[in-house]
């Protein structure tokens, strides 16, 4: 039996209907299945998630399942998996997603050939069987560059707007440098400060072509579909992302980008707020005011000018309230 070369971190909560597909596809990633180590974090599931993993992973030689009595959230669950990485490479997958055969072997080959800190890939969304290719927003393929050079321009979609942890693979030196862990306690938007830290502090990355990873959309239990107080975690997540940028030696270069992204996401959540409870809607508006105050004042107007007309209108009242306070 060969030693594993890649650790796959799979956090899951109540993923019983889907996780069998996820695990089955992981078993098709290498000709020798012992090259993969699977770490599953069952994050307080109340269904048969653990049993499904045990069943579908029964022929995989390197599987470890951690069980949290109560859910700790995606960020902390991923961190539990990161603490167990003992291979040269690691990656993430969520419990309702799956991947085409040989994806991970292709990514390992790219990592070894390019010798960079991490690689990123396109992904495919699946919404009730309707599939759409989502391209990683970076032109050059297979070319190693500084991650900092993939952050700008401020008014375009760039790699920091593509924060999906599962859309790539990482060398363990990213972990050793303290760049892989997520902000604990966040149930949503945990990947926003993470992606900024990664692109500001890692040394090299590339976007590469690989067999697809498929992201299942429209799952009713997914936090992207739930409109409750957990959605408000985007507020501390973006506050931390702003701090990450402000601490950088080129903060002035990147503040326009984080200001624009933050305000765009605030407008998005305000638009969705009509479906929230009154209490959550009030908390959202209060939190957005605080987040706007965290953005340097001189960045507000330029960032507003980069937004769509609709998003500017949505934010206008709160911006006035912050300025008049």
Regions found by a protein language model. Name each.
Residues 1-3, 35, 45, 113, ...:
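Membrane-interface aromatic/basic loop that binds lipid-linked glycans or pyrophosphate carriers
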Residues 4-7, 37, 193:
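Cell-envelope/extracellular polymer assembly enzymes that use nucleotide-activated donors
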Residues 14-28, 52:
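Short, well-formed alpha-helical segments that are part of the catalytic scaffolds
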Residues 42-51, 70:
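A conserved acidic beta->alpha catalytic loop
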Residues 68-85, 98:
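Glycine-rich, basic loop-to-helix element that forms the pyrophosphate-binding segment
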Residues 74, 95-208, 213-231, 241:
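Donor-binding/catalytic cores of nucleotide-activated saccharide
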Residues 210-219, 224-253, 266-268, 272-296:
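Catalytic core of nucleotide-sugar-dependent glycosyltransferases
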